[in-house]
């Protein structure tokens, strides 16, 4: 049932008496909405439990009205949006246009790029617009849809990073076993999206749009979590489960997988006779590969740890909202969408070769087929490619030492574990 305005004012005054003075001064707009004639308008359509939930959320900070702060945030988030879209769209374009890059591993890379594009388009702008306008302008339906899209894209990104790590682990640790087929890759990606949807639905369902009269001419809205009773425990354990599924578990799997891969690559011996120059080149490549693996783990851990801990502490009521901290942590987490294309593609020599080939095709007319030189194929494709044609295998063997050709083995030091080409 609806609560009489007199009782609301009485309860509000009781809550104010228990709050610290600075908390009230941080919420001038909300205080105005909850006093006097505005109170009856604000709570006309809400129950007593709605009022309790809303008052509980008043402790979690207010919006900054500083134009300089808003301008800086717009510039900072625009930087992420531009670079993330450019990098991830280009990754998808290069992989789709090049038949040689169509593999299960490439599907995972594309899925990661799609998830990062979703984060860029559906997470960053909603957060920024809500802060700049100090109100929710997207309507009741988008209050639920945006929350679902935000969490779903984050789960897809984390799960895809985990799938890539597991795939690389299988390739390096068991090089003679068949690679994951494209069909299985599609199935794994479908499972990732189903899991992400399942994990994201509670966040989408437990959202509510609160509307209040800010002034005589302005009505503002807030899209807030609205959990069933006991709301505090529900919120706390939901965020705890999200923290484990979205951060701790993927980080553990990625760390273990890449640690084993790095150890395998570092300890493996070169097959056949090699010169000192070749040995030093292979050693440098080992170091570069291990550094890339460490970079993947460190960036994932550093980018997402602050925001996840902040949200978990907030839902546990251990801290109050601090806008400066929130947007610093949020920006840092969102910036991972710019790093992923760089780590998984730009640092990979094969991807750069394919990108240059694609750009050269766009710049000048292509030569007749008989005049083209065959593209170099990495030596490790001989052992791992499922459907190797005779010509490609012969070309690959041309680059291998004679001892390797006779043994049919592959030198693990020549493998790039985060390669997008299979």
Curated annotation (Swiss-Prot):
Residue intervals passing through the bilayer: 71-91, 107-127, 144-166, 185-205, 237-257, 293-313, 327-347
Cytoplasmic side: 92-106, 167-184, 258-292, 348-422
SUPFAM superfamilies for this protein: Family A G protein-coupled receptor-like
One GO process term, biological-process aspect: G protein-coupled receptor signaling pathway
Assigned keywords, A-Z: Cell membrane, Disulfide bond, G-protein coupled receptor, Membrane, Receptor, Signal, Transducer, Transmembrane, Transmembrane helix
InterPro entries, per the entry: GPCR_Rhodpsn (IPR000276), GPCR_Rhodpsn_7TM (IPR017452), NPY_rcpt (IPR000611)
The keyword Transmembrane appears for this protein: yes
Signal peptide: 1-17
Known tissue expression: Expressed preferentially in brain, and its neuronal expression is relegated to limbic brain regions, particularly in forebrain.
Subcellular location: Cell membrane
An example Gene Ontology molecular-function term: neuropeptide receptor activity
Principal subcellular localisation of the protein: membrane
GO cellular component, one term: non-motile cilium
Disulfide bonds: 143-223
CDD domains from the UniProt entry: 7tmA_GPR83
Membrane topology: Multi-pass membrane protein
Sequence segments annotated as region (Disordered): 401-422
Gene3D superfamilies assigned to the protein according to its UniProt record, in alphabetical order: Rhodopsin 7-helix transmembrane proteins
Pfam family, one: 7tm_1
Induction cue: Increased in the prefrontal cortex of rat chronically treated with amphetamines.
SMART domains: 7TM_GPCR_Srsx
Record family assignment: Belongs to the G-protein coupled receptor 1 family.
Protein name per Swiss-Prot or TrEMBL: G-protein coupled receptor 83
Gene: Gpr83
């Amino acid at each position: 049932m609806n609560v009489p305005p007199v009782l609301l004012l009485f309860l509000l005054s009781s809550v104010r008496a228990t709050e610290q003075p600075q908390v009230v001064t941080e919420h001038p707009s909300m205080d105005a909405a909850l006093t006097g004639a505005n109170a009856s308008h604000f709570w006309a359509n809400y129950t007593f439990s709605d009022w309790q939930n809303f008052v509980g959320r008043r402790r979690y900070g207010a919006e900054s009205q500083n134009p300089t702060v808003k301008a800086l945030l717009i510039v900072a988030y625009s930087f992420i949006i531009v670079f993330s879209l450019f990098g991830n769209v280009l990754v998808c374009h290069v992989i789709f246009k090049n038949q040689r890059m169509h593999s299960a591993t490439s599907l995972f890379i594309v899925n990661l790029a799609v998830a990062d594009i979703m984060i860029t388009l559906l997470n960053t702008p909603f957060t920024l617009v809500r802060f700049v306008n100090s109100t929710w302008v997207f309507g009741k339906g988008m209050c639920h849809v945006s929350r679902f899209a935000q969490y779903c894209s984050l789960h897809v990104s984390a799960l895809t990073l985990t799938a890539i790590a597991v795939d690389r682990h299988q390739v390096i640790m068991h090089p003679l076993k068949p690679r994951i087929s494209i069909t299985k890759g599609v199935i794994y990606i479908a499972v990732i999206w189903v899991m992400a949807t399942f994990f994201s639905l509670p966040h989408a369902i437990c959202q509510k749009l609160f509307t209040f009269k800010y002034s005589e001419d302005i009505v503002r809205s807030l899209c807030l979590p609205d959990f069933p009773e006991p709301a505090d425990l529900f919120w706390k354990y939901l965020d705890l489960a999200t923290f484990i599924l979205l951060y701790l578990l993927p980080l553990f799997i990625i760390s273990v997988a890449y640690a084993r891969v790095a150890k395998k690559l570092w300890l493996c011996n070169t097959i056949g006779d090699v010169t000192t120059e070749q040995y030093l080149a292979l050693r440098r490549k080992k170091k570069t590969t291990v550094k890339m693996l460490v970079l993947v783990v460190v960036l994932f851990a550093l980018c997402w740890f602050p925001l996840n801990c902040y949200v978990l502490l907030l839902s546990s009521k251990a801290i109050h909202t601090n806008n400066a901290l929130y947007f610093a942590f949020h920006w840092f987490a969102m910036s991972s969408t710019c790093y992923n294309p760089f780590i998984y593609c730009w640092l990979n020599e094969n991807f750069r070769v394919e990108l240059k080939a694609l750009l050269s095709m766009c710049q000048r007319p292509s030569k007749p087929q008989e005049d083209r030189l065959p593209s170099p194929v990495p030596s490790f494709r001989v052992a791992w490619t499922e459907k190797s044609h005779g010509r490609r295998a012969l070309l690959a063997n041309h680059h291998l030492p004679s001892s390797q050709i006779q043994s049919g083995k592959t030198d693990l030091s020549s493998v790039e574990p985060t390669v997008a080409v299979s």
